[in-house]
Amino acid sequence: MRRPGLGGPCPLLLLLLLPAATSASGSSPSPSPSPIEKAVVPSHQAGVAACHCCLDQTPKSSRCTRASCRVRNCPPAKCTGLEGCLTPTPSVPSPSRSPVEKSQVSLNWQPLTLQEARALLRQRRPRGPWARALLKRRPPHRAPAGQARVLCPLICHNGGVCVKPDRCLCPPDFAGKFCQLHSSGARPPAPAMPGLTRSVYTMPLANHRDDEHGVASMVSVHVEHPQEASVVVHQVERVSGPWEEANPEALARAEAAARAEAAAPYTVLAQSAPREDGYSDASGFGYCFRELRGSECASPLPGLRTQEVCCRGEGLAWGVHDCHPCAEHLRNSNQVSGPNGPCPPGFERVNGSCVDVDECATGGRCQHGECANTRGGYTCVCPDGFLLDSSRSSCISQHVISEAKGPCYRVLHDGGCSLPILRNITKQICCCSRVGKAWGRGCQLCPPYGSEGFREICPAGPGYHYSASDLRYNTRPLNQDPPRVTFNQPRVPPATPRPPTGFLPTRRPEPRPDPGPQPEPRPRPEPRPRPESRPRPEPRPRPEPRPQPESQPRPESRPRPESQPWPEFPLPSIPAWTGPEIPESGPSSSMCQRNPQVCGPGRCVPRPSGYTCACDPGFRLGPQGTRCIDIDECRRVPTPCAPGRCENTPGSFRCVCGTGFQAGPRATECLDVDECRRVPPPCDRGRCENTPGSFLCVCPAGYQAAPHGASCQDVDECTQSPGLCGRGVCENLPGSFRCVCPAGFRGSACEEDVDECAQQPPPCGPGRCDNTAGSFHCACPAGFRSRGPGAPCQDVDECSRSPSPCAYGRCENTEGSFKCVCPTGFQPNAAGSECEDVDECENRLACPGQECVNSPGSFQCRACPVGHHLHRGRCTDVDECSSGTPCGLHGQCTNTKGSFHCSCSTGYRAPSGQPGPCADINECLEGDFCFPHGECLNTDGSFTCTCAPGYRPGPRGASCLDVDECSEEDLCQSGICTNTDGSFECICPPGHRAGPDLASCLDIDECRERGPALCGSQRCENSPGSYRCVRDCDPGYHPGPEGTCDDIDECREYGSAICGAQRCENTPGSYRCTPACDPGYQPTPGGGCQDVDECRNRSFCGAHAMCQNLPGSFQCVCDQGYEGARDGRHCVDVNECETLQGVCGSALCENVEGSFLCVCPNSPEEFDPMTGRCVPPRAPAGTFPGSQPQAPASPSLPARPPAPPPPRRPSPPRQGPVSSGRRECYFDTAAPDACDNILARNVTWQECCCTVGEGWGSGCRIQQCPGTETAEYQSLCPHGRGYLVPSGDLSARRDVDECQLFQDQVCKSGVCVNTAPGYSCYCSNGFYYHAHRLECVDNDECADEEPACEGGRCVNTVGSYHCTCEPPLVLDGSRRRCVSNESQSLDDNLGVCWQEVGPDLVCSRPRLDRQATYTECCCLYGEAWGMDCALCPAQDSDDFEALCNVLRPPAYGPPRPGGFGIPYEYGPDIGPPYQSLPYGPDLYPPPVLPYDPYPPPPGPFARREAPYGAPPFDMPDFEDDGGPYGESETPDPPSRGTGWPYRSRDTRGSFPEPEESSERGSYTGALSEPYEGLEAEECGILDGCPHGRCVRVPEGFTCDCFDGYRLDITRMSCVDVNECDEAEATSPLCVNARCVNTDGSFRCICRPGFAPTHQPHHCAPARPRA
């Protein structure tokens, strides 16, 4: 999956750098290409290509690699996206030197197609033997010395400027990562050629051997290109072969090479600047450059290195964004060259001559290897297990070139690996790219970035790796030179005839072969021979050329990671010319004449019987006598070059002398160099002694030999002995040292303290001197102080303090003290340390008759104010409240300064403006009180209202209010009292009249007023408001309609109040009161109540249920496959074919009593519950190896098909003493009581460890089972957990029946069902399976996050729970929610339906087209209801199932306790690889498609803990991996348990097949949109089954109505059921209550005198109030 990048995919752009055609036919199709001046330097071959890669891509071997997509090649004449590939210009070497030529090339910046590029390539074919170009950018300004800039990697368009490695500074009209987007309002620029800029590129040829003077060949090119195009060339390698000028076959081969998708045989090692989010300077890794010319860095080494590793190796500069020269290079560059010029690299000038530098003596080179000095350089010798890297300056571990491939995981969670990339790669690529977090099938963690483990496998730093082809060239022996190739003629005596120059035997260097298998290379076209006059023999295989000393190094050709060989550029047409190696028949002279080179390096001598060879010096005749072979002089004993190293050469040998030796007069000997005779001598300050190959420095006392042994260096005694000078400082001297003592110490080692107190005069003056170590301390008297240790006592100037100690005075300092001089009005204190004020007011005569007020330094006189009087010379306040009652009797006096204040009582107030007594307020004069129905009367402190008749004073007494006589008195009996303003009136009914007082209604006695004539012969009986004519009946009877006397039912006529708290029973002519019993109880003869046992009649609940008597009631517990009827007194069959939609798939569903069957229409097909289709019958047991006997299919547990054999041949199981015998198998061995955790006592090692066992042994001597990732486990259990290998047949496997092997130990308190592989443990309702304890444990429903008892208190019980409510709340019908009996049902009201609830429980998106009831909203449309945002129950909860009458997703079990259903709760029986799915509040995995669209509910109900773990199901398949139990094993669909086989749906609007989930919508959409895919007319005309769901059936469709609705077949809609009318009279729905029908349900309203009980729809007599 390609990660979306900024700006989308890169557009295709081809940038071609083509040499200009010299012929007339070389016109360019591109519009006005810019000319480029190119300097062509002969005698060298080279080519160049520069790749510019898109963002998040890096160039690698002329390929742009993106971590998020597949590798895209960057071959010649191709460019993709923001990549820019400059097409290389091939060239051919010149056979002879000629002056530099200049020509023109065209740089075409127009986007071209591949066909246009190929046509342009044909027209711009390079002509001439010396055409080639090198590019290198010249920066616009010179960088400071010692700091070179790495070019900015981004290509900024539309005039943008690259300011950071990942940022472009755009002009105002453009935006985007690369300034490629037009801002709002900006118009796109007109298409035009962008401005051109010129860059100059100058670089040496890489992999080119310097000549004997050490000067590299340099080339320069001037290039004009747009400003947004950036060219970065770090290194240029030579072209492998030349081109011929006018050879059609060579042009054809070049065209074929241009069409190839692989890279050319020359490469440009280009690298882009790193991204800031990948690594930074702080990471310590950067680029290492091997060349530094001026302020520019060039020739970077592949990979990343630290600055230390780079600078101590071959690097000259290092950096990430800026490259900094190494310190050692700066020192060398700053040295002044001698008179003879600079020395070549690796040499230094000593006494006017260049001497080899021993790089190994400086240390820090050849990391992980041993440094060996060579002339002009050094080499690294790597130990076993290490290889030379591509820079040949350090050794890297062989672990970095491991080619083992495995999955690379990008996510780690809870110790598991997930989200692997789409292909298997090596561990180095996975971890060094920092894309992967773990690698391999065993989930091996990648080492942390920057750790030692990371540096071991990623020595090149992050983002780079080594391949085997990169290092294969460096694994040759140390003394072996790179392969060389010569184009010169082999040496032969001058007299021997030579073939023509064009016929010289030559061979193009071939790339090194790859060890792995490779396809056959393309056949190379035979070169066209030049015309000649005499016939030529048939060409034969060309011999291997002999290396020559002066030959050029053979360029290395590294194969690509793929097995396809690199395409080659053609060679010039040179006919092959070789001689035969086998003598031919004929005269010998003709043989020597026909083939003068038949002897090789010798002369052919004809003989009568053939010929022989006269070999050149250094060669001898071969074993067959027909060819001269080289003599290896180095194999002679003794060796000819001791003590040097002998190197054999064709026809001779040479001696390579080691360090400390030099070649003697003869080339075959090495003489010792006497280093001691050098001027100046090498041993500074010492004596030099020469040794073979080296020298030794004898140093005097105080000196020691330097680490390199070439001089004597001073011994730093101060560093060797840190405590040499004690408290002093050790100062090193040449050959010695001295101690510098601090103040207060003396002696040679500063060990003697100086007693300063003994000196004269004493150092402390007036103080006491105390000597201390190295100093002294002064104890000063008062008025003196010391500034610290070693300081004398000095006088303290108290007058300089702030504030001054002499306030109001002048301070004068004295020796050790001070004195104060006070002004007038002040006097010094007793101590004389400060000035005190003189209080003149102490003299009473100072202010006669006035108050004296003292002030600092003076005083003043003033008279007393009002309310004050003079007391003892002071003005004091007069307390008016203490004399009399100034506020009167109704006020409280409060004294104030100079006056007083009166606080008056309510109804009183003080006079305004001045203090005075409180007077009464006349409210009748100030307010409109008591009006209009009363009169105001003032009282002392208040007032009263005298109201008119029919009125009374109000609550506050300020007004008169009307009296409602009708509500306060029992007026107008038998009439209606109507209140009037100030009175009332009685409205009497017919038959009544008002009384004399007009306050009551009296009955009119018609019998008395109208006399006996009113009823004739019958008796007139007056009644309230009327009368009647009746016969005379006995008491307790009344006349009937036919003139009879009928019994009066006093209990019905007078109600329950006739008997109070007892129950009324009617009797003939009377009634009686008996004690009351609740429903379900019956009275006893003694007056008590006892329970009625409804289950005494065993057929009370019918044939499919068991009657369970309860106190005051009963319960019918239905059998499996049945559900309770509406009346609760019998059970009816569940039609699974209707409730489980599409349960049989393509088969026909047939409902049977208590279950159902899936019948296939075509015989003899069988129904497969896993696929939901009818399939041909399976093969009988025993047909295939390892198959098990097939159990007959049953509705309870569908049989699973036998697992096929694994796809690969497994290794044999581990044999040995460990697996022999039978012992005990243990589980949970980490527990403290592991010895008691025994699964079985007589099992084998394989049976225990290949199942759920963790240890095996006897007597608690437990041997741990091997880990699943170990080789021992793979050998013991080759087919994985749950399978054993039958004896004698390693290719077969046998499933282990854990339920039979471990009996009840593996599924305690549950039902164990064997599966293949593994087993399933079915726990009772209210229990869940504990995977570690291997048993069913009770689930604490009260501890779940969702409240089990809504509005009440939850009490957990074993296997269940019950809810209690606080009065006046009662339990509803579900027994799981507390409701108020007086509250109105939610479904009686219509409200707004909210379609979405946010994470903060805020309702949004209301349904605006209609309002809905609570049930309609939650079941059909939304997530919350009403203005209070009442949340709907979760769709995977029991409440939702009960509310909406829906079948939950099959991945969940049946309803929890509290209703009718199956007595076992089943979790999803998910087999591998879907077992052990992690879930929780922070991590919900995607649903197990196609079964469950919702995250698992909280608590352990949602799933069964599988005994065998497996990787998470969301991991994509690997290219070469199967599942954990074989590729052909698929997970079983979830099972609903006994009688409920299930398959994934394949109909529209239902559960799609796994492969159809992405095309037909998710399972969530199938549940939330049940009408999707159905036509409108298929579900009727009323919006498709209102109050129900549209269900497909084989005959078409039908409506499945919700509870409380029934199907009206005429309208195909669900109509409300009136439960109140359809209830049977003998079994009413509401007991002691009135039934009220609602939409889809009903509710009960208790009758007067009755209250609701804990039983639903039951009301009991209310208790009388005390």
Swiss-Prot record:
Disulfide bonds, paired cysteine numbers? 152-162, 156-168, 170-179, 288-310, 297-323, 311-326, 360-371, 366-380, 382-395, 408-430, 417-443, 431-446, 432-458, 592-604, 599-613, 615-628, 634-646, 641-655, 657-670, 676-688, 683-697, 699-712, 718-730, 725-739, 741-750, 757-769, 764-778, 780-793, 799-811, 806-820, 822-835, 881-893, 887-902, 904-918, 924-936, 930-945, 947-960, 966-977, 972-986, 988-1001, 1095-1107, 1101-1116, 1118-1131, 1225-1248, 1235-1260, 1249-1265, 1250-1277, 1299-1312, 1307-1321, 1323-1336, 1342-1354, 1349-1363, 1365-1378, 1393-1417, 1403-1429, 1418-1432, 1419-1444, 1579-1590, 1585-1599, 1601-1614, 1620-1635, 1630-1644, 1646-1659
Q: Which Gene3D superfamilies match?
A: Laminin, TGF-beta binding (TB) domain
User: Does Secreted show up as a keyword for this record?
Assistant: yes
Comp. bias (Low complexity): 579-590, 1185-1197
> Which family is it part of?
Belongs to the LTBP family.
Q: Which UniProt keywords apply?
A: Disulfide bond, EGF-like domain, Extracellular matrix, Glycoprotein, Growth factor binding, Phosphoprotein, Repeat, Secreted, Signal
Q: What are the Phosphothreonine sites (modified residues) in this protein?
A: 1564
Q: What is the lineage of its organism?
A: Eukaryota, Metazoa, Chordata, Craniata, Vertebrata
Q: Which gene encodes it?
A: Ltbp4
Q: Which residues, if any, are the signal sequence?
A: 1-24
PTM annotation: Contains hydroxylated asparagine residues.
Q: Which GO terms describe its biological process?
A: elastic fiber assembly; hormone secretion; transforming growth factor beta receptor signaling pathway
Q: In terms of domain of life, where is this protein from?
A: Eukaryota
Q: What is this protein called?
A: Latent-transforming growth factor beta-binding protein 4
Q: Where is the TB domain?
A: 286-338, 406-458, 1223-1277, 1391-1444
Query: PROSITE patterns this protein is in?
Result: ASX_HYDROXYL, EGF_1, EGF_2, EGF_3, EGF_CA, TB
Biased composition, class Basic and acidic residues, residue ranges:
521-561
Q: Which residue intervals are annotated with compositional bias (Pro residues) in the record?
A: 491-502, 562-573, 1198-1215, 1488-1500
The record's statement on gene disruption is: Mice reveal significant disruption of elastic fibers in multiple tissues. They develop pulmonary septation defects, rectal prolapse, colorectal adenomas, and dilated cardiomyopathy. They survive up to six months (mid-adult age) without major clinical symptoms.
